[in-house]
């Protein structure tokens, strides 16, 4: 009997950003107004020069003399909150040249300073705005049109979807943001999450926040909120991306930073890992045993910690013997952070257990 050959996994599919969807639908609607031709697909050029054809769900005239077009957002194999959502554009021709952007249903409006879009503007980021403007300008030139375009971008159920994003905390109300820098969604890319971390820091700074807390999850946010009473705008949901916070503070510093996370996550940071996800870093139990020794653990206890199954078991062993392992881990984590952020930033680290109790502090 021959050995079975495992199937090779299919390559992950790329998708398209909401910015690409907005560009395609606004172009299709505008073309209908200028030519009378309703398209099934529309070709657009992405920021790096790639040409793509996007399929439309509809392209039709509206009762107010305008036109609208929609497309189903395909994020490829990326677990994107907007995957499968209907992104649409409603376009009207206006006398004044240029493009005026409006937030349609399901697209948010900026209410706080610190984002790349001014307060009061629809949450359509700079690159999607540029993409739409360039495509519409080329269309106008092609058909000798000297007027402008009123463009409203919407996302079906966008207001509900936005509650699953960081938009409410960033001060974007009423819906989603239209995003994208390359026009392409890369499967399981971290870039969008890291960008939201940076935006959170920018918004906090622009609104006068001097103490921010970067947290790995909801439990650590609750612990920081209970300890300091910080407002939501000061809480940065960093997840596993500690490095994204620390490195960004080199160019956008604050007076005070609190880093808070589960004991296991903080032990990874203490060991020098800046990506705390299990795919990229692991718990170093021998190192935890060594640190327990720094905190006064006996040789026997160090051996037990080294043989523990999890970081939580190691912590429980230490606490049962009144060894402040959490404080030592936090001190090492603070040292790692201190080596990255500017000297003027006051850094503190907090570790919590699975019940959300603070088990380590390094002020």
UniProtKB/Swiss-Prot annotation:
The record's annotation in InterPro entries points to:
CbiD, CbiD_sf
Which top-level group of life is the source organism from? Bacteria
Give the SUPFAM superfamilies listed for this entry.
CbiD-like
**Gene3D superfamilies, A to Z:** CbiD-like
Q: Give the EC number(s) under which this enzyme is classified.
A: 2.1.1.195
Query: In the record, what terms sit under GO molecular function?
Result: cobalt-precorrin-5B C1-methyltransferase activity
What keywords does the record list, in alphabetical order? Cobalamin biosynthesis, Methyltransferase, S-adenosyl-L-methionine, Transferase
Q: Transmembrane stretches, by residue range?
A: none
Instruction: Give the catalysed reaction(s), semicolon-separated.
Output: Co-precorrin-5B + S-adenosyl-L-methionine = Co-precorrin-6A + S-adenosyl-L-homocysteine
Family indicated by similarity: Belongs to the CbiD family.
Protein name, UniProt field = Cobalt-precorrin-5B C(1)-methyltransferase
Can you name the source organism?
A: Burkholderia pseudomallei (strain K96243)
The gene for this chain is cbiD
């Amino acid at each position: 009997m021959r050995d079975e050959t495992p199937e090779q996994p299919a390559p992950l599919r790329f998708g398209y950003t909401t910015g690409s969807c907005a560009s395609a639908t606004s172009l299709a609607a505008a073309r209908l107004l200028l030519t009378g031709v309703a398209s099934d697909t529309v070709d657009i050029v992405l920021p790096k020069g790639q040409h793509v054809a996007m399929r439309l769900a509809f392209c039709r005239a509206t009762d107010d003399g305008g036109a609208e077009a929609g497309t189903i957002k395909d994020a490829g194999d990326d677990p994107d909150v907007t995957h499968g959502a209907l992104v649409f554009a409603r376009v009207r021709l206006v006398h004044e040249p240029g493009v005026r952007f409006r937030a349609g249903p399901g697209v948010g409006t900026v209410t706080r300073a610190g984002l790349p879009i001014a307060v009061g503007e629809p949450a359509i980021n700079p690159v999607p705005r540029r993409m739409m403007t360039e495509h519409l300008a080329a269309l106008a030139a092609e058909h000798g049109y000297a007027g402008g375009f009123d463009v409203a971008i919407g996302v079906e159920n966008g207001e509900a979807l936005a509650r699953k994003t960081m938009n409410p905390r960033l001060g974007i109300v009423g819906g989603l943001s239209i995003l994208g820098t390359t026009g392409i969604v890369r499967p399981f890319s971290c870039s969008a999450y890291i960008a939201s971390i940076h935006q959170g820091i920018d918004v906090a700074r622009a609104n006068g926040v001097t103490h921010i807390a970067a947290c790995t999850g909801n439990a650590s946010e609750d612990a920081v909120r209970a300890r300091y009473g910080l407002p939501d705008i000061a809480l940065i949901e960093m997840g596993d991306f500690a490095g994204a916070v620390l490195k960004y503070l080199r160019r956008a510093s604050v007076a005070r930073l609190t880093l808070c996370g589960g004991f296991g996550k903080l032990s990874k940071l203490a060991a020098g890992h800046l990506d705390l996800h299990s795919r990229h870093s692991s718990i170093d139990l021998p190192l935890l045993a060594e640190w327990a020794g720094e905190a006064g653990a006996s040789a026997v206890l160090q051996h037990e910690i080294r043989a523990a199954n999890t970081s939580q078991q190691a912590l429980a062993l230490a606490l049962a013997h009144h060894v402040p392992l959490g404080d030592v881990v936090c001190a090492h984590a603070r040292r790692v952070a201190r080596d990255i952020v500017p000297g003027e930033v006051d850094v503190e680290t907090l570790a919590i257990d699975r019940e959300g109790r603070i088990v380590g502090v390094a002020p």
